[in-house]
Amino acid sequence: MPSFDIVSKVDMQEVDNAINQTVKEIAQRYDFKGSKCEVTLEKENIKVLADDDFKLKAVIDILQSKFIKRNISPKSLQYGKAEQASGSMVRQIITLQVGISKEKAKEIGQVIKETKLKVQSQIQDDQLRVTGKNIDDLQEVIRVLKGKDLDIDMQFVNFRS
């Protein structure tokens, strides 16, 4: 039976490259001269430290533009709350969304059921497998899911016929 998997993955090398480019741009920009802004990657978290809210927003804008240039979807970023750090610094933690949570997988499964196509979806750890008798039905499911705004970065892999 034809099938495919729905996954949510991020290329960590590209994330590292985007962060390095962000740090480089912050060091070169005139409006950041003399400020103590930092962007660091710790496993699946990006820590942004800035002098004030304005600079924090500017750093996050730079980071997002670098992510987009490196073909990393902004939907794969989950923003934490901006909080006061030591002194007058502001800190924000950005979490990389890797894998599909059970709740999101159920939501995607519900969207697939609403299409009323003859396909089944199974939740497998942090991914979702969709199987069906007809390849055209599977392609229709992919088209529908790409059209929906599910606030998650999805890739469709292992398309088998």
From Swiss-Prot:
SUPFAM superfamilies: YajQ-like. One of its GO terms (cellular component) is cytosol. CDD domains: YajQ_like. The keyword Nucleotide-binding applies. Disulfide bonds: none annotated. Keywords: Nucleotide-binding. One of its GO terms (molecular function) is nucleotide binding. Nucleotide-binding protein. Belongs to the YajQ family. This is Nucleotide-binding protein Gbem_0619. It comes from Citrifermentans bemidjiense (strain ATCC BAA-1014 / DSM 16622 / JCM 12645 / Bem) (Geobacter bemidjiensis). The lineage of its organism: Bacteria, Pseudomonadati, Thermodesulfobacteriota, Desulfuromonadia, Geobacterales.
